[in-house]
Structures are given as C-alpha cells and as structure tokens.
C-alpha cells in the first residue's frame, strides 16, 4: 500500500493508475536514510506528502549501514505512465560528516550548536552535473530540479529535526 491504490486519471477514455516521481522516491529514501542513521533503528517504510497533497507510503529497500552512514532505496512506480525509470531503485546515502577543529583536531558533528541541521545535497551515480548556465543550479552542481531538490532537503531536515536536539 503506497497511498495511490484508488488514484486514477482518465486520459483518452482510459483509466490510468497514478504513480510517483523519481523526486518522491529520492525524498522518501532521504527521510529513511537520515532517520535510520540518527536513530540506529531499521525502518521498512516512510511516509511523506507530495507537492500535490497526496500522502505516500514508500517501502525502503537495500538498506546498507556503515560506520557513519546509511544508504537505502525506494523503488520507482510510475503507475501507467510509460516512464523509462519505472521499477528502478532510487538510492540515497545519508552520512554524518564533521568539521575538524584546527586547534585540537577533534571531529565535531556538523550542526552542533546550529539552529537547523546542516544538510549537503549532492547527486550520486546516475545524476548528471550542470555544465552550462541557464539551469537553476550553478555549474558543477548536481542536476536536480528545484521541486525534487526542495522535497529531498525538506524530508532530510524534518527527519533530522525529529531525532536530534540542536
């Protein structure tokens, strides 16, 4: 059950099943990875709202833990849309990073003492890079469109805020 079981659109007199976007998959995986990283618990699914007001429940797959990271994936379901990304696993890796204190060489978690967690978003395998001006991101940044970028950052930040006291 993902929240879309009874959602359809009629197009050319055909009833087409709703699906969800790659951005929703990435946002769900980000939420799951951050929650598992900070809580130490295993999750099987996450719930998130879409920009259209639909609440999705997304299963988490291929969970991997390391010393300071958790990665997981959400499987894309494009519904009846002929999307070439249908069925792929969209991965996110959440990692604790630190800043070295120049005097003590101690590693301090980023976000300590800050009013909000500091979240750095970058693309991984399969995500292109901006190479020319004209997109909403700077040259060299991951080519993640504004709405999915905002969704990913929102879900990661909300997950972090729900589990840490800054």
Describe each model-derived feature in a short phrase:
Residues 40-41, 58-60, 84, 132-134:
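Short, glycine/acidic-enriched capping/hinge loops at junctions between secondary-structure elements
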Residues 10-48, 116, 136-162:
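Alpha/propeptide regions of enzymes that mature by internal proteolysis
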Residues 68-99, 108-161:
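A generic, well-ordered mixed alpha/beta core segment in the N-terminal half of proteins
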